[in-house]
């Protein structure tokens, strides 16, 4: 029931003059190790590791946004810096990026804060022989976007206990998910009588969300799946209230 937890957005860099003459390539050669980043408060920095599986070097650009996927990296302000923000990743090699919390923006100390780590994989420009053969070309960069959770040091419970504290309530619309914990609960599935609920999504700390399902009554058994700290599917059960 696993899902890839990061989104890939295609960004077009060069103009296409005639489609019939165009050569096309869109491979994500630089891979991020992991599907989420957790930044524990008080830690000097965290490392994001990259791997380039291609036979040629790649150029990558990294930045962090605060929830707007369309924000221009040049004007996005968050309390983090990435070193280096632009890096060359050699063929069949790896690269480490360092994320450091600057403290430039005060964050709540009683709950997690959510940001997004972005990586743009920019493919190399074709060589002279390729250009001579094909003429014009379309170059595509692939963007990966991962959740970054800033986690305060002294929360009221740990993340494993928090999963068990979420309350599920039967409503006419389906299931009201009441997350009165300091953690984001990244749900990816909810079953009622072996039927999947709709509108399943991440529920922020100390907030609620409705997952759409028909005929849910108090006392019914529910099965849920969420993504845990390690990026793995975590399954559990609950009784609707």
UniProtKB/Swiss-Prot annotation:
Protein location: Periplasm
GO CC annotation: outer membrane-bounded periplasmic space
Example GO BP: cell wall organization
Keyword Amino-acid biosynthesis: no
Chief location bin: periplasm
Keywords: Chaperone, Fimbrium biogenesis, Immunoglobulin domain, Periplasm, Signal
Signal peptide (UniProt feature, chain positions): 1-27
InterPro entries: Ig-like_fold (IPR013783), PapD-like_sf (IPR008962), Periplasmic_pilus_chap (IPR050643), Pili_assmbl_chap_C_dom_sf (IPR036316), Pili_assmbl_chaperone_bac (IPR001829), Pili_assmbl_chaperone_C (IPR016148), Pili_assmbl_chaperone_CS (IPR018046), Pili_assmbl_chaperone_N (IPR016147)
Statement: the UniProt record of this protein carries the keyword Ribonucleoprotein: no
Job of this protein: Mediates assembly of pili by forming soluble multimeric complexes with pili subunits as an intermediate step in the assembly process. This protein is involved in type B pili (HifA) assembly.
PANTHER family documented for this protein: FIMBRIAL CHAPERONE YADV-RELATED, PILUS ASSEMBLY CHAPERONE
Family, per entry: Belongs to the periplasmic pilus chaperone family.
Name of the protein in its database record: Chaperone protein HifB
Native source species: Haemophilus influenzae
Classification of source organism: Bacteria, Pseudomonadati, Pseudomonadota, Gammaproteobacteria, Pasteurellales
């Amino acid at each position: 029931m696993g899902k890839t937890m990061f989104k890939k957005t295609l960004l077009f860099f060069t103009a296409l003059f005639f489609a019939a003459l165009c050569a096309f390539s869109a491979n994500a050669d630089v891979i991020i190790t992991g599907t989420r980043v957790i930044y524990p408060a008080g830690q000097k920095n965290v490392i994001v590791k990259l791997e380039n599986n291609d036979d040629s070097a790649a150029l990558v650009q990294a930045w962090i946004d605060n929830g707007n996927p369309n924000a221009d990296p040049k004007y996005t302000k968050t309390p983090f810096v990435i070193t280096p923000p632009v890096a060359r990743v050699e063929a069949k090699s790896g690269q480490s990026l360092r994320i450091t919390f600057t403290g430039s923006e005060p964050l709540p100390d009683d709950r997690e804060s959510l940001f997004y780590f972005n990586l743009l994989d920019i493919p190399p420009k074709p060589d002279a022989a390729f250009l001579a053969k094909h003429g014009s070309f379309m170059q595509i960069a692939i963007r990966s976007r991962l959740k970054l959770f800033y986690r305060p040091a002294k929360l009221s419970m740990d993340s494993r206990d928090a999963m068990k504290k979420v309350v599920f309530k039967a409503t006419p619309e389906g299931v009201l998910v009441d997350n009165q914990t300091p953690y984001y609960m990244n749900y990816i599935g909810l079953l009622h009588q072996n039927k999947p609920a709709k509108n399943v999504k991440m529920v922020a700390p100390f907030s609620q969300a409705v997952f759409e399902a028909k005929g849910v009554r108090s006392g019914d058994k529910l099965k849920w799946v969420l993504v845990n700290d390690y990026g793995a599917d975590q399954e559990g059960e609950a009784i609707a209230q």
